[in-house]
Amino acid sequence: IIRGLVGSEMCIRDRSNVIKEFNSLKNDDYIGWIGHATFLIKLGETTIITDPVFSKNAGPLIFGPKRFTEPALNLDELPEINLFLLTHNHYDHQDMSTIRKFPYKQAKVMLPLKLGKYFKRYKDVNEMDWYDEITVNNDLKVTFLPAVHWSKRSLTDTNKTLWGNFLINYKGKKILFACDTGVGNIYKDLGEKYGPIDLTILNIGAYNFYPMAPYKDKSTYHTNPEEALSIARNLKSKKVLGMHWGTFVLSLEPIMEPRQRFKDNAQNYGYKSDEALIFKIGEFQSVSYTHLTLPTTEAV
């Protein structure tokens, strides 16, 4: 219990400060971490949400891992959402309770092939294959790209639906929001074709499944912090922001380990401390694309 309390204080902002900071930035472009893989990203007139999960557990009904930290905002506190991005169908990313209760069903939804059936009450649902591109407006387009991952929600549907990364191109600047991913040569190819990337948001947690998996420090489908940094480097990413840690306990590494390893090893992959970013849950940072000023964070 003590470990949990200390960890929670280290990775989440005080709720009153979250609301205050969010309100102060609501007319600006920003990136904010709600928790796990859920981000709010405002770019011009478009507010984006990624892999929204607001339930108390990541699993069917009341089952699955419980939240270690609460979402930074409640569903009814969200701003109007214009674009809903879903990377894949695992329970800690595709949360049916959130999808049913989501208040902005007029938002444009972009999601992998074969997942549109879960969004029957939504007005604008777009299934995407790898390398599909959708123009949102004159300033913003989104491309769906491969990731080293898999899909499954039941005993009989393994890899029956697609999964992937989203490349957000806003006024010529690029943010790559990653699906859960492992290491693969595909990232060198993507770096050559789409790089340089201005900001990559990558999973850095859920990598120790030993003894269920043969290695204590590696997962085929989830990068550890060092592997995430190597992917960012292969993508020619100028900055990299670690996610997918501190929210649900999905694996056996200590809850705060991903954050520390990510920061400790950044320089080994060519990233300065203000280029390898860690947010607290509930942290919102302004984004200026005029001078390409991407987020910086407090020292950790």
Residue ranges and their predicted role:
Residues 1-7, 12, 291-300:
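Single conserved hydrophobic/aromatic residue that forms the stacking wall/gate
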Residues 3, 8-9, 13-77, 108-179, 261-283, 287, ...:
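Metallo-beta-lactamase
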Residues 41, 51, 88, 142, ...:
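Divalent metal-coordination and catalytic microenvironments
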Residues 54-70, 150-156, 209-221:
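Acidic/histidine-rich helix-loop elements
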Residues 62-111, 195-201:
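Active-site metal-binding motif and surrounding structural segment of the metallo-beta-lactamase
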